[in-house]
Design a protein with these regions (language model features):
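Substrate/ligand-engaging "lid" and interaction regions
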Residues: 1-487
């Protein structure tokens, strides 16, 4: 079967309905992963179909993903998004990508030169929490991170996203060019502030004058992104190939729902993403807190406790009334009360929509995938609501059970005695603690004492220790399904 390209798509109605030859690489995106393909690049594609804009995207993978970039090049930088509803699938061919680079396929210098080109107005990122080289508990730069150490020692040959951004801004400053906006699109609370803090701290260690120039001239808008995008599987790619009549190794499937809330703070212009459904606002924080706590927090709850309960996919957990009810109750009783939202926000309606999205059987979103990088996610998704309930003296049993589920998961052994492939930047540290205690409740205060995940105000709080210990003991004695059903 042929691969997707301009020539193989000429007989299809799915071609982008705008002139791709007029596009310029005005956006450089770091991290051509599944989420970006189904979200920001798709928003840009739909914006282009509704305007006469020339905002194209240069895609860059810094770590791995060489094959993806090579495939993208062979198919004229076209790829497919399959929006899978419960009963039907809509396939869209995305044409907003103009070119692509990879330091191991091209060169570090080629990447830096692209970022330094005068027409580049935005450098956006989906590099995950760990890509910011930040301490998850404080949000400040982790100066002991090997990538940070390497980039400070050899700044003209960067490895990290921070290193590339700071070096590219240095080049632009030296050439008298305007800077670009740095736009984080990662699922991290106040992602723009975290990106700014990390960039400024890194630049301070490298060149204090450059740091001051960046602070004065560069903007770091916060964004809230939402769309469930499972990792691509062979089944996904086969389905896309059957629908298209040609293969697309860059294809991705996702749910129909999408949301993008953007702080309107750009130093060198921006696309009119609002015509594609994005919202430009003055303050993103309430929206991202709503999403991180209600959606992502319950997603983590379902991931750890669902995996332990033998459920492979989030939609599988929704067939269990105990999990379905516990997820909704967690949203409404543990997370929603901790939020301060603009007037008129319907949190109950939002929670019901989330349950509907989680139930979509077409997505096959693996609990194991969502369970990755828990040490980075838990502070963002549960820390704020935990503080709220401690201050209010209210019930936080759902949060305690979610944290206990994570602790049981990172032990590396499931309820049948099989190994769990724990993927986490702190996996080795966590495994060592778990190995010292075995499946014993004594592990709880030890894991809560890891301040990179749990600040002392939470990890050493007797109420937190007691509640998490109680939930952990229930997981050992009764298993995940019974523990969830009892909530």
């Amino acid at each position: 079967m042929k691969t997707i390209s301009n020539s193989t798509l000429n007989d299809h109605v799915l071609l982008p309905d705008y002139d791709r030859s007029t596009l310029k690489s005005r956006i450089v995106h770091l991290g051509f992963g599944a989420f970006h393909r189904a979200h920001q690049a798709l928003f840009t594609n739909e914006m282009l179909s509704k305007t006469s804009s020339d905002w194209g995207i240069c895609e860059i993978n810094l770590f791995g993903g060489e094959e993806l970039i090579q495939s993208l090049r062979t198919q004229d930088h076209l790829y497919t998004v399959a929006e899978k509803g419960a009963e039907s699938t809509e396939v869209k061919v995305i044409g907003s990508v103009t070119e692509s680079l990879h330091p191991s396929l091209d060169s570090i210098q080629a990447v830096l030169e692209k970022m330094a080109e005068p027409q580049v107005a935005i450098v956006s990122m989906t590099i995950t929490e760990k890509g910011y080289c930040a301490d998850p508990a404080t949000g400040t730069l982790d100066k002991n991170n090997p990538l940070v150490i390497a980039d400070l020692a050899n700044p003209t040959e960067p490895k990290s996203a921070l290193g590339y951004i700071v070096q590219a801004l240095k080049i632009r400053r030296e050439r008298g060019l305007t800077p670009f906006t740095v736009m984080s699109c990662d699922n991290v609370q106040e992602n723009g502030h975290i990106a700014k803090a990390a960039v400024l701290e890194f630049a301070q260690l490298l060149d204090p004058e450059l740091r001051d120039w960046i602070e004065t001239n560069v903007t770091f808008p916060c964004t809230m992104v939402d769309r469930i995008v499972p990792a691509a599987t062979e089944e996904t790619l086969t389905e896309i190939a059957e629908l298209l009549g040609c293969e697309d190794p860059c294809g991705i499937a996702c749910e129909p729902f999408r949301q993008w809330v953007i702080e309107d703070n750009f130093v060198a212009g921006r696309p009119d993403w609002n015509v594609a459904g994005a919202e430009f606002v003055a303050d993103v924080v309430p929206y991202e807190e709503m999403k991180l706590r209600m959606l992502n927090g319950s997603h983590s709850f379902l991931a750890y406790l669902g995996y332990l309960g033998g459920y492979a996919h989030i939609s599988d957990t929704m067939t269990d009334e105990g999990y379905r009810k516990a997820a909704f109750d967690m949203m409404m009783q543990a997370q929603a009360p901790s939020l301060t939202m603009p007037e008129g926000t319907d949190l109950e309606g939002y929670a019901k929509l989330l349950i509907e999205r989680f139930t979509n059987p077409s997505l096959k979103h693996k609990t194991w995938q969502i369970a990755m990088d828990g040490s980075q996610k838990i502070p963002q998704r549960m820390g704020g609501s935990l503080r709220f309930h401690l201050a209010q003296g209210s019930n936080f049993s759902w949060l305690a059970t979610a944290i206990a589920g994570w602790m049981r998961y990172v032990s590396g052994v499931d309820e049948q005695g099989n190994d769990i492939d724990v993927r986490d930047p702190m996996a080795e540290t966590l495994r060592q603690i778990c190995d010292q205690h075995g499946l014993n409740v004594s592990v709880v205060p030890e894991l809560l004492a890891v301040e990179a995940i749990f600040p002392a105000e939470l990890g050493q709080n007797p109420q937190v220790i007691d509640a998490v210990s109680s939930a952990y003991q229930s997981l050992i004695d009764n298993g995940a399904r019974a523990t969830v059903a009892a909530l």
